[in-house]
C-alpha cells in the first residue's frame, strides 16, 4: 500500500499476536514483486493504538482469525474493514505448499489494494467509502 499508494497513503503492518520476526516467505514475496523489504519488523497492533501513534484513516484486518477478535480502539476513529485471507503461516506441507500460500495471500492483498486505490475518494462520502472498503474485503 505504501509503495502503490504514495504519496496519498502510508501503510503500516501489525498483528494481534506478532510472531517476533517477519517470515522469510513474506519477505520473498515482496522481493519477487520488486517492493522494498528492508527494515521491516514484527509488531503488535497495540503499537498503533497508543497516544502519539500515527493517525490512521483506514484500518484493514486481514487474518481470518482477526475477524473474531476484539480490535483496539483506534485513535481518530478510522474506517475499518475486514479483508480476511487464509493465514499463510498456518500452512503445513512441503516448502512449495508454504511458498504457494504466501504467494496466494500476497496476490489477494495486492488485488484488494488495487481496488482500494482505484476508488474515487474525492467524489465519495464517508458512508460510500465504508461500503466500498467492506465490499472489497468480500471479493
Regions found by a protein language model. Give the residues of each.
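Short glycine-rich anion-binding loops that position phosphate/pyrophosphate groups of nucleotides
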Residues: 64-67
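Structural signal for conserved beta-strand scaffold positions within catalytic alpha/beta enzyme cores
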Residues: 13, 61, 81-84
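Phosphate-binding/catalytic loops
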Residues: 70-139
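Generic detector of well-ordered secondary structure
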Residues: 32, 62, 110-111
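Conserved active-site segments centered on acidic
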Residues: 1-50
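Alpha-helix C-terminal capping/helix-to-coil transition sites in glycosyltransferase folds
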Residues: 54-55
